[in-house]
């Protein structure tokens, strides 16, 4: 009797495994979207003022870290011009205007703005 029960249990387990392998993966899991990749595609080559970390401003001489920090902490923005409403020095406004065409604004994403990830994104050299 124990042997029969053991065989039946094994048969049920094997049938379950075969059924799980036979079902398509689309049935097993919903379409998973990566918010960060979607935002990268949306912004293109520009720096998104609502979702980028201060490190993205390193490519613009004079902006990192002081002006970049002010911009990151001053958001969210409706348009790129909203940055000029911040308390910036004349030099900082001049720098921002110099690189203005390199920036864009998309809707803020919780996944990219949670905690202090925009100030310290954990990337160290």
From Swiss-Prot:
It is found in: Cellular thylakoid membrane. Pfam families: PsbU. One of its GO terms (cellular component) is extrinsic component of membrane. Residues 1-29 form the signal peptide. One of its GO terms (biological process) is photosynthesis. Keywords: Electron transport, Membrane, Photosynthesis, Photosystem II, Signal, Thylakoid, Transport. It comes from the Bacteria. InterPro entries: PSII_PsbU (IPR010527). Its main location: membrane. It is a peripheral membrane protein. One of the extrinsic, lumenal subunits of photosystem II (PSII). PSII is a light-driven water plastoquinone oxidoreductase, using light energy to abstract electrons from H(2)O, generating a proton gradient subsequently used for ATP formation. The extrinsic proteins stabilize the structure of photosystem II oxygen-evolving complex (OEC), the ion environment of oxygen evolution and protect the OEC against heat-induced inactivation. Belongs to the PsbU family. PSII is composed of 1 copy each of membrane proteins PsbA, PsbB, PsbC, PsbD, PsbE, PsbF, PsbH, PsbI, PsbJ, PsbK, PsbL, PsbM, PsbT, PsbX, PsbY, PsbZ, Psb30/Ycf12, peripheral proteins PsbO, CyanoQ (PsbQ), PsbU, PsbV and a large number of cofactors. It forms dimeric complexes. This is Photosystem II extrinsic protein U. The gene is psbU.
